Swiss-Prot record:
Protein name: Meiosis-specific nuclear structural protein 1
Originating species: Homo sapiens
Gene that this sequence comes from: MNS1
Lineage: superkingdom: Eukaryota
One GO CC term, this protein: intermediate filament
PANTHER family with a match to the protein in the record: MEIOSIS-SPECIFIC NUCLEAR STRUCTURAL PROTEIN 1 (PTHR19265:SF0)
Major localization listed first in the record, in broad terms: nucleus
Subunit details: Able to form oligomers. Microtubule inner protein component of sperm flagellar doublet microtubules. Interacts with ODAD1. Interacts with BBOF1.
Amino acid sequence: MGSKRRNLSCSERHQKLVDENYCKKLHVQALKNVNSQIRNQMVQNENDNRVQRKQFLRLLQNEQFELDMEEAIQKAEENKRLKELQLKQEEKLAMELAKLKHESLKDEKMRQQVRENSIELRELEKKLKAAYMNKERAAQIAEKDAIKYEQMKRDAEIAKTMMEEHKRIIKEENAAEDKRNKAKAQYYLDLEKQLEEQEKKKQEAYEQLLKEKLMIDEIVRKIYEEDQLEKQQKLEKMNAMRRYIEEFQKEQALWRKKKREEMEEENRKIIEFANMQQQREEDRMAKVQENEEKRLQLQNALTQKLEEMLRQREDLEQVRQELYQEEQAEIYKSKLKEEAEKKLRKQKEMKQDFEEQMALKELVLQAAKEEEENFRKTMLAKFAEDDRIELMNAQKQRMKQLEHRRAVEKLIEERRQQFLADKQRELEEWQLQQRRQGFINAIIEEERLKLLKEHATNLLGYLPKGVFKKEDDIDLLGEEFRKVYQQRSEICEEK
């Protein structure tokens, strides 16, 4: 029973293990199924999400496409509107530019006509041309004077060069003369030295001769002592020797005297040469001084001549300017006189015209009154004839006559209004003409100032009188021009 129980237990355990393994397998299988379901569900969810995402993206793309299309349409409409606006602006700008160009051409044409027809501008251009001619003439005179000055300067330089060359030659000659004098002096010194050496040699020879004489005397004495027999011969020999010595001494004295005389003559010649050299040097210095004075005189003469020429040129230019200014002043005076006479004549003509106009106005008014009166009578008569007033009773006659007078007065008032309208139109035309004349005068003034600004600076100092109408013209040309113009005016007044 015990073994059976043990066997059962083993079977049970085995069965239990089998059951447990089976349960585990079932559990694993269930887990696998669950995992598979979960994976499938996740895949399904992911597919659904992908589809939803694609649908959402497609929806967004459609909305973005619609927005882009709408924006493109709006942008195209805006571009079209901007192009139309730009086209209108360009057309407006082109019209304005054409208008400005037309006005500019019209203004330029009018200015050209004013320039061509303005007497004042033509006179100013003539004066400016005359100033340019004066400037050119002054430049030519200055150029001629400059050429003369350069010629005189070259002549002065040539004279200076010749003087320097002359001085150099004199200096070289003096240097050569000094060199020769030094050579002569050295020669005389060498000669004197040779003479001294010769004198010294002769003195030494003389001393040697004396020594020999003493020796001879000693020998003679010894010979006299030794050989009495030969005494006479020796004495004669001694006498001969003495005579020789005496003759030698005489000759030496004569030679010394001659040499002294020669030395004195040489010294005299040297002194004469030195005096002559000094005199020559003094003559040379005097000649140099004379040449220097001549050069200075020539230079002063050239300078004075140049100054005289410059002064004559300035005087001539001043005379020309004064003559030109006087001529221009006379022209200006005659012009002022003509303008005054013209103005006076114009005033007289205007006065006469005014009187004639007043008289004519009186006549016109009188004629108008007479015409109105005649017109009134005529119209009243016409109305009366048309309406047969005489056939009416008194009340109707008065009413009809009053009606006729009113009609006539209305016609007369209409004629008056027409007359006033005509006069108003004439006044407006006259005012327009005055404005046009004022505009023309402004153009003339602008062109005049333009000409002055363009040419006055280049013609400063050559402008004739009458170019500037007022002081403001000078101020308009700048501070520097005004200062230079005032300085030149002060210089002309001082002259």
